[in-house]
Amino acid sequence: MHKRDYKMDNLRFLLIFLVLLGHFMELFKGDFTSAFYKIIYSFHMPAFLFLTGYFARFHRRKLVLGLIYPYILFQIFYRIFDGLIYNSKGTFTIEFGTPYWILWYLLVTIFYYLLLPLLDTKNRNSQITIVITSIVLALLAGFDTSLGYYGSLARFFSFLPFFIAGFYTARAETNFRFPAWFIFVLGVILIVASHYIITSPEITKKVLYGSYSYEKAKYNAGIKLFLLSLGFAWIVFLLFVIPRKKVPFLSVLGQNTLAIFLLHGFIVRLAKKYQIFCYSEAENILFAVILSLSIIALLGNLWIAKWFHRLFTGSWISHLLKKRT
């Protein structure tokens, strides 16, 4: 019987919390807010895509019902929702080539899953070659000004190394144990690197999103390589410090991050519409933390997760197909 990997559940909880917190922090300003926001965006999505790769297995039904189906569904839902709350006439347009805001994650994951049969090798040298190739592609993609939000192609290349690394890490069956001195040195490096990210005028929010070319975001391949390296450094650090034991309440919520991720956007859009972050910076941050944790507790509970899975991941279609066969 497969043993539950609570370390990964705990890490997913932390990352989904940072996703929500980051989205709420976009809605207000402040020096600390700006600095913390940049630190979050330097690693939280690289780590999320690493975990996505870690748990990735190619199944046609999973691809269609677990990824393509919810992408189409929520692309429609969010377009209608935005049209209703932001357009006085209630009009909206629906198209699927350019994902709506947070749905870029689903679209690039669909593309990554399509690559899995090509990535499926147990040869260590081949794995290393593929990871290095993906890093080179991520660096070269920054020169192409045609890559952007359409098809999430810019992000596809930007986060590809993390997904592939996660996929191969799962196959290596590592225990994520590192010497204490190594983690100490890595922690110092992360502090220095984070200070550089905060103070560097070249590393803007656009750069951290992974959606813009070097020309459009005014940076270069050197900074891109630095950010890729930093993303991997954060992943190693987090895999060491996150507890491997079950943490009451948190571990369970970490198992149900898809529902939280896809549904929280509606709340964020309403928060922006009604400008609920209208206090001092410190009060806004506290409000954002409490709101993020409350949403995770609400949307990540087992009951919501069960019904979300039934309705929005195509499991009901799978159930009907099984009945007919």
Named regions from a protein language model:
Residues 1-325:
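Alpha-helical transmembrane segments and their immediate juxtamembrane cytosolic regions
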